[in-house]
Design a protein with these regions (language model features):
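Short helix-capping/linker turns of helical repeat alpha-solenoids
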Residues: 60-62, 76, 95-97, 110-111, ...
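Structural signature of tandem alpha-helical TPR/SEL1-like repeats
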Residues: 45-49, 77-88, 113-124, 148-158, ...
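Bacterial signal peptide processing site
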Residues: 30-32
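Post-signal-peptide N-terminal segment of Sec-exported extracytoplasmic proteins
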Residues: 36-87, 98, 135, 139
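Terminal, low-structured helical/coil segments at or just beyond the last alpha-helical repeat
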Residues: 419-472
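Alpha-solenoid helical repeat scaffolds
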Residues: 55, 90, 126, 161, ...
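Hydrophobic face of amphipathic alpha-helices that form TPR/SEL1-like repeat modules
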Residues: 68-75, 104-110, 140-146, 177-181, ...
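Short, low-complexity intrinsically disordered segments enriched in A/P/G/S/L with frequent Arg
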Residues: 1-6, 10-11, 15
Length: 472
C-alpha cells in the first residue's frame, strides 16, 4: 500500500523527498525500511522484521506504517499492546481511511466498551466505508447485533437488507452473521449457500460457511467439489492457509454432522509446515479422534506448534496434563503450560481457576481461583460461571457466600445444562425475596459489564481477515 503523507500545498513534494533522503541517511541504502517488505514479512508471520520496518517508517511520520505497527500490536492479543494500538490508530485516523477502519473494528470488538465508544466505532466504520475501505460493513453489522441498546433506532435486519439492495459485496456476509448471532443459521442453510456461492471468488471465508452448510445438510458430493475448488484456490494463492485450517476444523467437528476426520488431517498436514497454527489443529483433531495417531504423533504436533509460539499448543498440552488421559496427570506441568497461554487463550484462565479451586496442587487457592475464573467468564468462557458458583457455594478453603453463589449460578444458566439449572434452583431456595432482588441486580450489573452476546465477538474475529495487511 502506498504511503500517505499529510499534504501541504507547495511543500508536499519537497517534504516527501526530504523525508526519503532522511530515511536513506538514517538507515543506509541496504537497511532502508520498506513498507512492501514489512507487509510481506507480516504475511509470512515474520512479525519481528515487519515491526522493525514499520517502526522506522512510523517514526518518520508515515501514517500507513503507523497502522501496520498497530496491526502487529493487536496481533499480540496483549491488552497493554492493544491499548497502544488504539492510540496509534487514533493518531493516524485523520489522514488514513485504513486507520479509521482499524480503529472502528478495534472499538467494535473491545470488551466492555462504553456507549460513546460504540458510537465512535459506528462513525469511523461508516467514514472508512465511504472512503472505499473493505471489511467495514461486517463489523458495523456486528456492532448493531451485539449492542442493540446502544443503537435503539437501528433495525439490524432492515439495515442489512438495504445494503443488499444497494449491491454492497459485504452485505451477504453480514446477513450470514445475523443468522449466526441470532441462532437461526440452521433454518437458513439454503440462503447461506446462495449468498456464499455468489461471493466465493471474492470472499474466502465463504469456503468455511459452505463447508459448514454441506456438513449440516449431509452432502458429501458437494463438499468434495468445494474442497477441489478450494485446493485450486490455494495453488493460485487466492485462498489463505488460515481458511484451509478453518475448513479442516469444520470437517472434523462432529457437532455439525458426520465428521470426515481423515480428509481434515490430510488438509492440515499439507499446510502446517507453512502455517504453524495448523500443527495445533492437527493435535486437536488427534485429541478428538485418537484413532488417527498415537501419543508420539500428538507430542510431535504440539512441539511443532510450541516451537512457533502457538498459545493454543500450550493450552492443549496443559489440558493433556490436567486430564491425564494421553499422559500421566501432572497438575504442576499443566499449570506451567496454562500460564504460558494466559492472556492469549481464554480457556487457560478457566483451567488455572479449576486447578486452584479443586486443590490439585495440594491445597485450595480460593482468591487465585476466583481471579482466573472471573477473567475467563468475562471473556466469554461459559463454564466459568458454573465453577465460580461452585466456589462460592462449597466454600472450600473459604467461607461460603450464598449471595454471590446465587449470582453466578444465575449467569451459569445461560449454558442450559442440567447441572447448571439444578445448581441455580438449589441456591435460590434458601434466599429471602430481598436477597433475590439484590442478586438479580448484581446479575444485570455483571451482564452489562460483559456486553450482550459476549460470544459473538468471537464471530467477529472469525470473520476478520487475519493475513498480512488485512488483519484487524
Amino acid at each position: 500500500s502506498g504511503s500517505k503523507l499529510p499534504r501541504h500545498k507547495g511543500s508536499a513534494h519537497i517534504g516527501s523527498v526530504a523525508l526519503i533522503a532522511l530515511a536513506i541517511s538514517l538507515a543506509g541504502c541496504a537497511g532502508l525500511p520498506d513498507q512492501r517488505l514489512a507487509n510481506e514479512a507480516l504475511k509470512r508471520g515474520d512479525t519481528v522484521t515487519a515491526q522493525q520496518n514499520y517502526q522506522q517508517l512510523a517514526d518518520l511520520g508515515y501514517s500507513e506504517a503507523q497502522v501496520g505497527l498497530a496491526d502487529i500490536q493487536v496481533g499480540t492479543r496483549d491488552p497493554a499492546q492493544i491499548k497502544q494500538a488504539e492510540a496509534t490508530y487514533r493518531a493516524a485516523a485523520d489522514t488514513s481511511p485504513r486507520a479509521q477502519a482499524r480503529l472502528g473494528r478495534l472499538l467494535a470488538a473491545k470488551p466492555g466498551a462504553t456507549e460513546a465508544e460504540h458510537h465512535e466505532a459506528e462513525s469511523l466504520l461508516k467514514k472508512a466505508f465511504a472512503n472505499g475501505e473493505g471489511n467495514t460493513l461486517i463489523p458495523l453489522a456486528m456492532l448493531y447485533l451485539q449492542y442493540p441498546h446502544s443503537f435503539p433506532n437501528v433495525n439490524a435486519q432492515q439495515q442489512i437488507s438495504q445494503w443488499q439492495a444497494a449491491g454492497y459485496p459485504e452485505a451477504g456476509l453480514a446477513q450470514v452473521l445475523l443468522y449466526r448471532t441470532q441462532g437461526t443459521y440452521d433454518q437458513h442453510l439454503d440462503d447461506v449457500e446462495r449468498i456464499c456461492k455468489a461471493a466465493l471468488n471474492t470472499t474466502d471465508i465463504c469456503y468455511v460457511e459452505l463447508a459448514t452448510v454441506y456438513q449440516k445438510k449431509q452432502q458429501p458430493e458437494q463438499q468434495a467439489e468445494l474442497l477441489k475448488q478450494m485446493e485450486a484456490g490455494v495453488s493460485r494463492d487466492t485462498v489463505t492457509a488460515q481458511r484451509v485450517d478453518s475448513v479442516a476444523r469444520v470437517l472434523g467437528d462432529a457437532t455439525l454432522g458426520t465428521p470426515d476426520e481423515k480428509t481434515a488431517q490430510a488438509l492440515l498436514e499439507k499446510i502446517a509446515p507453512g502455517y504453524p497454527a495448523s500443527w495445533v489443529s492437527l493435535a486437536q483433531l488427534l485429541y478428538d479422534f485418537p484413532e488417527l495417531g498415537d501419543v508420539d504423533q500428538m507430542m510431535k504436533y504440539l512441539d511443532n506448534g510450541r516451537a512457533a509460539d502457538q498459545p493454543r499448543a500450550e493450552l492443549l498440552l496443559g489440558k493433556l496434563y490436567y486430564e491425564g488421559k494421553w499422559v500421566p496427570a501432572d497438575a504442576k506441568a499443566a499449570e506451567a503450560h496454562f500460564e504460558k497461554a494466559v492472556g492469549r487463550e481464554v480457556a487457560a484462565d478457566y483451567y488455572l481457576g479449576q486447578i486452584y479451586r479443586r486443590g490439585y496442587l495440594g491445597k485450595v487457592y480460593p482468591q487465585k481461583a476466583l481471579d482466573h475464573l472471573l477473567t475467563a467468564a468475562r471473556n466469554g468462557q461459559n463454564s466459568a460461571d458454573f465453577a465460580i458458583a461452585q466456589l462460592f457455594s462449597q466454600g472450600k478453603g473459604t467461607k461460603p457466600d450464598p449471595l454471590n453463589a446465587y449470582v453466578f449460578s444465575q449467569l451459569a444458566k445461560a449454558q442450559d445444562t442440567p447441572e447448571a439449572n439444578d445448581l441455580a434452583t438449589q441456591l435460590e431456595a434458601p434466599l429471602t425475596p430481598e436477597q433475590r432482588a439484590e442478586g438479580q441486580r448484581l446479575v444485570q450489573q455483571e451482564l452489562a459489564a460483559r456486553g450482550t452476546l459476549a460470544q459473538s465477538t468471537l464471530q467477529l474475529h472469525a470473520l476478520q481477515e487475519e493475513d498480512g495487511e488485512e488483519s484487524l
